[in-house]
Amino acid sequence: MTARARAVLLRLILVIGASVGGFILLQEPARWLETHAALGLLQPFAGDRLTAVVGTSIVVVPIHGLPFTVDVTPSCSALASILTLACLATVLPRTTRARRLGALSAAIVTVALGNIVRIAASVGVGLVAGRSSLILFHDWVGSMFSFAYTLGGYVLMLYIVLPKVARNREAEVHAQLA
């Protein structure tokens, strides 16, 4: 095995290890933070119809129907997407460390805020329309929203890292095409 192949293999092992280890270590605090942030986002509108219970659960008292509990499970957390973006940041084109860190930070903020809004929207639908509507919204609209904010975070990360094309160069190309 060449030195280059060993370096690539070592990087791969470190990235996978960091992802798995990061998920195991951070999934509980991440879910707690997302649960309480979503609750804080909805509380001004919901009043006493929403209460936080132990850890990563929210008790919802819908306008019509029986109360139910919403659990933010590990698969509902943005942590997997955030760790994926962190892994992808290790293979971004060469740039300064500050630029790479800034790009990764912007992507992480995009994904984390997107997920908090998704959780709050799902709970809000449950508050207004009941448990089955929450499940339907979470499974269909929430999944599409998750895809959109994760992809958006990745594209933002690339936008920040990739070199910018000079505006005058763009104008020259457009003039040649016209």
Positions of the model-derived regions?
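Hydrophobic N-terminal alpha-helices or hydrophobic patches in metabolic proteins across all domains
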Residues: 1-178
